[in-house]
């Protein structure tokens, strides 16, 4: 079987080779010569591969023979020991077959032998491609030209390449054997476009009378070339080439001189504030930022401004555009005072982070406060909002932050800034003292007839107090605003009806005499009364206090209410009048609770009616005085309500009339003094003192009325009457029209504060 198989294979192989050589179809042998004698094997066509039937898989598969394995291995370049027999058989078949034509052998190249190895460049002269040639040859140069001058000339047309090893420009000026310049040179550009630009612009140009000629450089071998002298390439050559490519970027050239670092543009300001300052009023942070921006903008353009509100050192940073601007800011602000603190200014070191993160406890407290605010009722929330607004608008040390102008006076500025609240309190006290002095000077003349018309002025004043109390939450009453500052809580004096009447009668006398200024009693509104003025005068003058005590004893014995004023002047008051005034006061208080703001305009008529009822119960001597007072009061009330619409000329005419009434009133005062002398002989000395005081006060009031009061009355009265119209109170109008020169200063400043609120 083995012999048959070998003979069959040899014949099959021979047929295949003959088919390849001659292109003919090999003859297929008989089916008997097939290697397998199985019944299921079928004869195949001569040009096809023989197949055999697989009984297990029930399919035809190519018949695997030695020839099939040999052809398979020959196609895939695989050789094994098992294929040696097939190769031997092939050689035997070649001897039998027709000789094939000889094939030309391809000589093996060194590339095929050295696959994967880098080809070494042959040592010899180099040739530069035209597309990559960026060298320019310039001839006709002046013999005295220098390398720097040549570089400056050639750099006008492009970027000159630098040597990657020496970092010098690739330019060369040729010299002869003796070292003298020949007048030609070479320049190597970075880009090909620079060569074309130099050929167009520099060719045929003249320098110092020498005509230049420019052309593309051509390199030729002259003599013998020694390859051993060629420079070796540096390992970092590629890195330096990449650095040269950066010269083509659109980057501005660096300025000459030392380059300053970026963090030198930032200024750090310390001790600007304290973190606790922002807990009560967080809006202070915006105020400090705005003040700092305004101050630092004087030194240059500000790029960024930050306040590190949680930093314990009170740090703020200001970033300028240029370092020079930051230097100017540091030089100016270092050591200056801001908000009562001496600040320090320095440049940022570039590493310190001044941002302080919020701790978990602080975050919980902040969220707890916010939750309490959200859960609070809307009414209390609105009150808090109004309180915060009012507190933010009130002048205080937190609102007085500013930079000191003179650093040399830093100590004085520090004391002033730290005692800002004390300055405000002293200002208020000075206002109070001025108003008090003004009230004492006016009291000598105005309070002589304090008893007369006391009940007449009671209603308007109390009505004005009610109007002020109603509007206290909305607009704020200026009289109440002055109470805590001046420290005059006088609730006991309000309960005394006769004393209140005496005070209001004195106000009526001020209007009659034409003294349209505010006294200390009017500054304090409804709370300043005759009893307090009695206490103040007792501290100034002991003799007046004794006279007041005697008069008070006399009132208790006789059963009549006699008012004792600041000058010690006493008035004749009947017991019947005083007995009737007390029930009238009770009736007035009940009427005040029922009246609204709309009834303030009718206060003058109601007061006149009450005066008429009082005159019925008075004696004949008092009736004359009351009648004169009624006429004068009518003129005063008409003037008070007409001043808002009258011009300045009408006010001056009214003032002249009041001056005449003041002269008449002085005569009445003399009559009252005489009556008082007849009724009581023990008080002659006090009467003489009262007359002296009256004469001195008359002179003072005459001078003030002729020179100062009428000139100053126009501006303040108009403002005060406007305020009275807005509030709708009669008492306030009367007080505004009867203030003194000293107290008008205090009230004018307080009115300004109220307007701001």
UniProtKB/Swiss-Prot annotation:
Region feature (Disordered): 1-54, 80-123, 383-417, 432-757
All copies of domain RRM, residue ranges: 134-219, 265-350
Disulfide bond entries: none
Gene3D superfamilies in alphabetical order: 3.30.70.330
Sequence segments annotated as region (U2AF homology motif (UHM)): 260-354
InterPro entries: Nucleotide-bd_a/b_plait_sf, RBD_domain_sf, RRM_dom, RRM_dom_euk, TatSF1-like, TatSF1-like_RRM1
N-acetylserine: modified positions: 2
Biased composition (Acidic residues): 539-551, 610-635, 643-671, 678-688
Coiled-coil residue windows: none
TM region(s), chain numbering: none
GO molecular function terms attached to this record: chromatin-protein adaptor activity; poly-ADP-D-ribose modification-dependent protein binding; RNA binding
Phosphoserine: residues carrying this PTM: 388, 404, 408, 410, 441, 446, 519, 528, 556, 560, 578, 598, 604, 613, 621, 645, 679, 705, 724, 749
Free-text description of this protein's post-translational modifications in UniProt: Phosphorylation at Ser-749 by CK2 during S-phase in response to DNA damage promotes interaction with TOPBP1 and double-strand break (DSB) repair via homologous recombination.
One Gene Ontology CC term in the entry: U2-type spliceosomal complex
Subunit structure: Component of the 17S U2 SnRNP complex, a ribonucleoprotein complex that contains small nuclear RNA (snRNA) U2 and a number of specific proteins. Within the 17S U2 SnRNP complex, interacts (via UHM region) directly with SF3B1. Component of a complex which is at least composed of HTATSF1/Tat-SF1, the P-TEFb complex components CDK9 and CCNT1, RNA polymerase II, SUPT5H, and NCL/nucleolin. Interacts with GTF2F2/RAP30 and POLR2A. Interacts with TCERG1/CA150. Interacts with (poly-ADP-ribosylated) RPA1; promoting HTATSF1 recruitment to DNA damage sites.
Homology family: Belongs to the HTATSF1 family.
Protein known as: 17S U2 SnRNP complex component HTATSF1
């Amino acid at each position: 079987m083995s012999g048959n198989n070998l003979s069959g294979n040899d014949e099959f192989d021979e047929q295949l080779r003959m088919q390849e050589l001659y292109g003919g179809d090999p003859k297929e042998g008989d089916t008997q010569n097939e290697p397998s004698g199985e019944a299921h094997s079928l004869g195949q066509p001569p040009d096809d591969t023989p197949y055999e039937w697989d009984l297990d898989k029930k399919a035809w598969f190519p018949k695997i023979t030695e020839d099939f394995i040999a052809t398979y291995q020959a196609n895939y370049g695989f050789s094994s020991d098992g294929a040696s027999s097939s190769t031997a058989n092939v050689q035997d078949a070649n001897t039998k077959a027709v000789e094939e034509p000889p094939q030309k052998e391809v000589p093996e190249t060194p590339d095929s032998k050295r696959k994967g190895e880098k080809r070494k460049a042959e040592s010899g002269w180099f040739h530069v491609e035209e597309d990559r040639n960026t060298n320019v040859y310039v001839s006709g140069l002046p013999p005295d030209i220098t390398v720097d001058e040549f570089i400056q000339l050639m750099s006008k047309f492009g970027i000159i390449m630098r040597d990657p090893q020496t970092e010098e420009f690739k330019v060369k000026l040729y010299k002869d054997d003796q070292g003298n310049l020949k007048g030609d040179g070479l320049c190597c550009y970075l880009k090909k476009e620079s060569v074309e630009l130099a050929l167009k612009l520099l060719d045929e140009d003249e320098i110092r009378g020498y005509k230049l000629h420019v052309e593309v450089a051509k390199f030729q071998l002259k003599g013998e070339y020694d390859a051993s002298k060629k420079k070796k390439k540096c390992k970092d050559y590629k890195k330096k080439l990449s650095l040269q490519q950066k010269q083509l970027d659109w980057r501005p050239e660096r300025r000459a001189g030392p380059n300053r670092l970026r963090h030198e543009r930032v200024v750090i300001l310390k001790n600007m504030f304290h973190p606790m300052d922002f807990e009560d009023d967080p809006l202070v942070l915006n105020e400090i930022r705005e003040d700092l921006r305004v101050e630092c903008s004087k030194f240059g353009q500000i790029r960024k401004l930050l306040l590190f509100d949680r930093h314990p050192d009170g740090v703020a940073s200001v970033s300028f555009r240029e370092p020079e601007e930051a230097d100017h800011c540091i030089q100016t602000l270092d050591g200056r005072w801001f908000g009562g603190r001496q600040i320090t200014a320095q440049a940022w070191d570039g590493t310190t982070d001044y941002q302080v993160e919020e701790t978990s406890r602080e975050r919980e407290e902040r969220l707890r406060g916010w939750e309490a605010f959200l859960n609070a009722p809307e009414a209390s929330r609105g009150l808090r909002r109004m309180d915060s607004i009012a507190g933010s608008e009130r002048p205080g040390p937190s609102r007085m932050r500013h930079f000191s102008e003179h650093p040399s006076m830093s100590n004085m500025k520090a004391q002033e800034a730290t005692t800002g609240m004390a300055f405000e309190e002293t200002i208020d006290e000075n206002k109070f003292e001025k108003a008090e002095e003004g009230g004492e000077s006016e009291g000598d003349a105005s309070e002589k007839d304090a008893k007369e018309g006391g009940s007449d002025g009671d209603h308007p004043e109390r009505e004005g107090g009610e109007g002020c109390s109603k509007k206290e939450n909305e607009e704020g009453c200026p009289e109440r605003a002055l109470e805590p500052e001046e420290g005059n809580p006088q609730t006991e004096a309000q309960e005394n009806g006769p004393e209140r009447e005496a005070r209001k009668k004195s106000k009526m006398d001020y209007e009659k005499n034409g003294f349209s200024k505010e006294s200390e009693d009017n500054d304090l509104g409804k709370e300043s009364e005759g009893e307090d003025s009695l206490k103040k005068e007792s501290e100034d003058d002991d003799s007046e206090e004794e006279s007041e005590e005697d008069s008070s004893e006399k009132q208790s014995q006789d059963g009549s209410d006699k008012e004792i004023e600041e000058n010690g002047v006493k008035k004749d008051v009947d017991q019947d009048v005083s007995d009737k005034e007390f029930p009238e006061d009770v009736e007035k208080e009940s009427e005040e609770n029922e009246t609204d703001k709309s009834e303030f305009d009718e206060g003058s008529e109601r007061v006149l009616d009450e005066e008429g009822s009082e005159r019925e119960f008075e004696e004949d001597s008092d009736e004359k005085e009351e009648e004169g007072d009624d006429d004068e009061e009518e003129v005063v009330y008409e003037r008070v309500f007409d001043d808002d619409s009258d011009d300045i000329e009408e006010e001056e005419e009214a003032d002249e009339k009041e001056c005449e009434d003041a002269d008449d009133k002085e005569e009445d005062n003399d009559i009252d003094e005489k009556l008082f002398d007849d009724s009581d002989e023990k008080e002659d000395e006090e009467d003489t003192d009262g007359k002296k005081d009256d004469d001195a006060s008359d002179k003072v009031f005459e001078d003030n009325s002729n020179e100062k009061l009428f000139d100053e009355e126009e501006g303040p009265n108009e403002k005060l009457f406007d305020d009275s119209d807005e509030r709708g109170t009669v008492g306030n109008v009367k007080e505004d029209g009867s203030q003194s020169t000293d107290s008008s200063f205090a009230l004018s400043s307080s009115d300004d504060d109220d307007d701001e609120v």
